[in-house]
Amino acid sequence: MTVSNTVDQYTIMSGDRSKIKDLLCNRLTECGWRDEVRLLCRNILLEKSNSSNGVTVEQLIAEVTPKARTLVPDAVKKELLMKIRTILAENEAEN
C-alpha cells in the first residue's frame, strides 16, 4: 500500500477527509480557481461546438483536468499539505 493510499484510508476512517475536502473547496472558491476552471470549460465548449461532433463530458474532463491542476495556487497546496501533516501528527501522538 502506498503512502498516499494509507493517508487516504486514514482520513476516511477518522472522518477528517470531509474536513479536508471542505477546506479545499473553500480555498479554491476564495482564490477564484473555480471561476477560472468554469471559464476554461466554457471556452473549450465554445471552441469545440463548431466541430460537427461536439465534445463529450469525458473529452472535456480529459482536456480540462491537467490545466485545472496547474491553476491550483501553491499556497492552497501548501495549506492542505500542512493540514494533512497536522492530522497525521495528531494521530501518531494519540497512538
From Swiss-Prot:
Pfam assignment, any one: EnY2
Main location: nucleus
Transcription in keyword set: yes
Gene Ontology molecular-function annotations: chromatin insulator sequence binding; transcription coactivator activity
GO cellular component term, pick one: DUBm complex
Location in the cell: Nucleus, Nucleoplasm; Cytoplasm
Lineage top rank: taxon: Eukaryota
InterPro entries xrefs: TF_ENY2 (IPR018783), TF_EnY2_sf (IPR038212)
Keyword Cytoplasm part of the UniProt annotation: yes
GO BP annotations, alphabetical order: chromatin organization; mRNA export from nucleus; positive regulation of transcription by RNA polymerase II; protein transport; transcription elongation by RNA polymerase II
Key words of the record: Activator, Chromatin regulator, Cytoplasm, mRNA transport, Nucleus, Protein transport, Transcription, Transcription regulation, Translocation, Transport
Subunit structure: Component of the nuclear pore complex (NPC)-associated AMEX complex (anchoring and mRNA export complex), composed of at least e(y)2 and xmas-2. Component of the SAGA transcription coactivator-HAT complexes, at least composed of Ada2b, e(y)2, Pcaf/Gcn5, Taf10 and Nipped-A/Trrap. Within the SAGA complex, e(y)2, Sgf11, and not/nonstop form an additional subcomplex of SAGA called the DUB module (deubiquitination module). Component of the THO complex, composed of at least e(y)2, HPR1, THO2, THOC5, THOC6 and THOC7. Interacts with e(y)1. Interacts with su(Hw) (via zinc fingers).
HAMAP family: ENY2_Sus1 (MF_03046)
PANTHER family reported in the protein's UniProt record: ENHANCER OF YELLOW 2 TRANSCRIPTION FACTOR (PTHR12514)
Record's function text: Involved in mRNA export coupled transcription activation by association with both the AMEX and the SAGA complexes. The SAGA complex is a multiprotein complex that activates transcription by remodeling chromatin and mediating histone acetylation and deubiquitination. Within the SAGA complex, participates in a subcomplex that specifically deubiquitinates histone H2B. The SAGA complex is recruited to specific gene promoters by activators, where it is required for transcription. Required for nuclear receptor-mediated transactivation.
Similarity comment: Belongs to the ENY2 family.
Protein name (Swiss-Prot/TrEMBL): Enhancer of yellow 2 transcription factor
Gene transcribed to yield this protein: e(y)2
